[in-house]
């Protein structure tokens, strides 16, 4: 195989026929994984916070059980099956044509959110109850104590677990072939069909690309933990104590 042919096939693995055609290959894998990871993290953390608050309200615990049941159902459904359902059910429910990539991102985000919610709920419980009680004793509202004291610490505790879920999401994008999305693995199959004599080289290059993507994600928690140091968490207490002391100081003056 000539150098020109190698570069041509490598370009197809990276971006597909873009800009003369739709974006595909590794670029589409990264784009779908990024959207799915962001959506899954936001929804998953939101569900964990909601479950925490619902459990504190005896008359709404049935709603917490219903939400847990829904999340458990999403975790039990195979990702491939969920993509297939999303591909057919979302356009039927909305009554409009929905791009295949949107259905894949929706399915990946739903599954990821279910796992992240479970992880974050465990992280919230891992934070000592004494810290929440101390915040309440200082006059914080329960939701305020949860969001400003407990959640930042739970986030740092569960970062490795979140990174594992993000890596799984990247790898699960390879299942998008079921709805005809030409992501990295599908693009590799197309390249291999053109160069039948070089399957090891083609799929070896794909393995390297997946390794680089997943390694970058696994390194992300270390950077995030460095940017959310305990000093940052303690500053929340300092700001709150200053806010509590300000009315008393104003009254004296």
Regions found by a protein language model. Name each.
Residues 1-253:
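Transmembrane alpha-helices and adjacent helix-loop boundaries
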């Amino acid at each position: 195989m000539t150098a020109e042919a190698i570069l041509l096939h490598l370009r197809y693995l990276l971006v597909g026929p873009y800009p003369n055609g739709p974006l595909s290959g590794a670029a589409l894998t990264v784009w779908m994984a990024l959207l799915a990871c962001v959506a899954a993290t936001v929804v998953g953390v939101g569900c964990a916070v909601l479950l925490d608050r619902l459990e504190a309200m005896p008359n709404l615990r049935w709603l917490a059980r219903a939400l847990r049941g829904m999340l458990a159902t999403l975790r039990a459904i195979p990702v491939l099956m969920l993509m297939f359902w999303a591909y057919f059910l979302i356009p039927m429910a909305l009554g409009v044509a929905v791009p295949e990539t949107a259905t894949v991102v929706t399915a990946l985000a739903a599954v990821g959110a279910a796992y992240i919610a479970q992880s974050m709920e465990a992280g919230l419980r891992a934070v000592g109850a004494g810290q929440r009680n101390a915040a309440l004793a200082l006059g914080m509202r329960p939701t305020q104590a949860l969001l400003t004291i407990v959640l930042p610490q739970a986030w740092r505790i569960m970062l490795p677990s979140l990174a594992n879920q993000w890596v799984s999401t990247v790898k699960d994008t390879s299942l998008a072939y079921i709805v005809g999305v030409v992501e990295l693995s599908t693009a590799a199959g197309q390249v291999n069909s053109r160069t039948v004599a070089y399957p090891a080289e083609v799929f070896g290059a794909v393995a390297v690309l997946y390794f680089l993507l997943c390694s970058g994600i696994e390194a992300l928690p270390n950077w995030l933990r460095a940017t959310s140091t305990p000093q940052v968490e303690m500053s929340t207490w300092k700001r709150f104590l200053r806010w509590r002391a300000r009315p008393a100081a104003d009254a004296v003056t």
